[in-house]
């Protein structure tokens, strides 16, 4: 359930409200023995309701069905799939293939990674801060599996005199001389997935379509599992050269595409391991889609498929790696924002924080600067006045165990877990603990556990939450010259159309205008920190 939903609160009551819109029966676990003596039927009803909710959640989310799909692909029992890690999926297929090919299988072992053992990761083409228009996103289909197949990368083909030379220096035998186990397995999985997807298109039965869709998704998960385990430091077949070779080929691919596009005057505003974001020279839907399809066909070669995944209009980033937000307008128009890397996606952010950030992004994409400022100021004012429900301020974090940290007495999740146990609730190491900060001025800060369905009778530290909101919002609005102090004062008058800020969009003059340094365009206003008292 944690893998599927990543909910901010993991109690049965909280997940039931999130998924089913229903809650547990109101029985205090601390007085369960008394309830059993006085009202046995109610306790029985309570237990039946708990079991019913848990089963319905599993069926609604599809956890069991997804486990069965992965079990089918990996040839494992469902129980093993649901409780094991990804290396078990890879092991099941790879050990079978090794046994049938007469290849020895190492005993599993664990080794602590050393700093100099870490392989270089994928390439990231940093995005400069700004608002971009008509952004084409091209994404490699199954990039790592395709690279492994194309270059015959495997522990069985790694040799000093191989014909295939990785950018990292490792050499592999050509498939004509020796076909690797890993490329053979991945080729079979890729063909299996293509066959399933063809059957999906052919069927008119919704139930069969749903089943096949789950199956092809499971094949994709298993395919991508192999790079992960070979790039790790614990897998039985791990060799540093293999993981390094895969990422080296990936970096070469992506940087080559970026160089080609930019030499032709097509600005690439962002790129990562397997995708590139290009500013379209056409400023309309039809023209941008045509350009995107052309580039997709052009760079799909040598067994690699570069798909035209989506078109965004507009897209915003404040310049941090892997953090952006945009509106998808193709292949289908989406009402929801696509958000990557910001607090909206983090399970330890509180709901009001996520909600305000989502609304703030919407106004930024609409170039509504006055609305953005008003939103932040009004939200902070409401928090300081205590006009927000406690459940909007809940912070959650996983707790490994009560003695799993060096300074447990300073950890908010430990403090909340202990108080939760005092209230009669069970604690299981690894579970997510939820709390509300009641006094941030102390060291450590004081927190109280929040239990879904149980009234919260303490007073939150509203000043603490207001400060967090201003700090979070300022990281976004500083792109436009609005600092944390400006947000608290509400006095900054910059707009998206002032000379201090030029949205990074393609113009008729040509791409060279887009490429001007953002540092020359954005002047961040410096000011002293302003207290919340001064704000009011």
Regions found by a protein language model. Give the residues of each.
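Active-site-proximal helix-loop-helix substrate-binding element of RNase H-like nuclease domains
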Residues: 1-51
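Catalytic nucleotidyl-transfer cores of nucleotide-processing enzymes
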Residues: 7, 111-230, 322-335, 339, ...
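Generic non-transmembrane alpha-helical segments
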Residues: 19, 253-264, 290-302
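Common nucleic-acid-contacting/processivity interface regions adjacent to the catalytic cores
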Residues: 33-142, 146-149, 208-252, 256-260, ...
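Catalytic palm active-site di-aspartate
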Residues: 193, 265-279
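Catalytic palm subdomain of template-directed nucleic-acid polymerases
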Residues: 276-293
């Amino acid at each position: 359930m944690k893998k599927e939903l990543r909910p901010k609160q993991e109690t049965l009551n909280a997940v039931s409200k999130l998924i089913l819109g229903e809650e547990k029966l109101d029985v205090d676990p601390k007085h369960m023995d008394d309830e059993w003596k006085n009202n046995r039927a109610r306790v029985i009803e309570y237990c039946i309701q708990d079991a019913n909710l848990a089963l319905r959640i599993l069926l609604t989310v599809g956890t069991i069905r997804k486990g069965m799909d992965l079990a089918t692909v990996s040839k494992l029992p469902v129980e093993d799939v649901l409780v094991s890690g990804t290396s078990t999926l890879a092991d099941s297929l790879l050990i079978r293939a090794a046994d049938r090919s007469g290849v020895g299988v190492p005993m599993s072992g664990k080794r602590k990674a050393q700093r100099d053992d870490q392989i270089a990761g994928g390439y990231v083409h940093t995005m400069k801060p700004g608002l971009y228009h008509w952004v084409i996103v091209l994404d490699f289909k199954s990039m790592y599996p395709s690279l492994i197949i194309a270059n015959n990368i495997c522990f069985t083909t790694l040799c000093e005199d191989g014909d295939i030379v990785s950018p990292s220096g490792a050499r592999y035998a050509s498939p004509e001389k020796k076909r690797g186990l890993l490329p053979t397995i991945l080729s079979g999985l890729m063909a299996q997935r293509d066959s399933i997807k063809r059957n999906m298109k052919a069927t008119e039965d919704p139930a069969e379509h749903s089943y096949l869709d789950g199956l092809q998704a499971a094949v994709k998960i298993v395919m991508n599992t192999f790079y992960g385990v070979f790039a790790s430091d614990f897998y039985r077949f791990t060799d540093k050269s293999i993981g390094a070779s895969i990422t080296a080929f990936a970096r070469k691919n992506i940087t080559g595409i970026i160089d080609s596009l930019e030499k032709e005057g097509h600005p690439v505003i962002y790129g990562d391991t397997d995708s590139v974001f290009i500013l379209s020279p056409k400023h309309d839907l039809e023209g941008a889609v045509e350009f995107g399809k052309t580039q997709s066909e052009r760079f799909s070669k040598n067994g690699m498929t570069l798909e035209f995944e989506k078109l965004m209009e507009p897209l915003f980033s404040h310049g941090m790696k892997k953090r952006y937000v945009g509106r998808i307008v193709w292949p289908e128009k989406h009402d929801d924002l696509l958000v990557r890397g910001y607090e909206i996606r983090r399970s330890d952010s509180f709901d009001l924080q996520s909600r305000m950030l989502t609304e703030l992004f919407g106004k930024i994409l609409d170039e509504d600067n006055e609305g953005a400022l008003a939103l932040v100021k009004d939200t902070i004012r409401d928090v300081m006045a205590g006009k927000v429900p406690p459940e909007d301020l809940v912070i959650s974090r996983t707790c490994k165990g009560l003695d799993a940290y060096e300074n447990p007495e300073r950890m908010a999740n430990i403090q909340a877990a202990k108080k939760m146990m005092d209230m009669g609730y069970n604690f299981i190491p690894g579970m997510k603990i939820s709390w509300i900060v009641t006094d941030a001025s102390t060291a450590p800060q004081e927190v109280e556990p929040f239990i879904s369905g149980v009234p919260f009778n303490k007073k939150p530290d509203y000043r603490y939450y207001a400060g967090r909101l201003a700090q979070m919002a300022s990281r976004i609005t500083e792109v436009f010259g609005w600092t944390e102090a400006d947000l608290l004062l509400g006095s900054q008058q910059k707009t998206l159309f002032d000379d201090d800020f030029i949205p990074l969009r393609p113009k008729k003059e040509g791409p060279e205008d887009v490429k001007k340094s953002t540092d020359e365009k954005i002047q961040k206003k410096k000011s002293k920190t302003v207290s919340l008292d001064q704000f009011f």
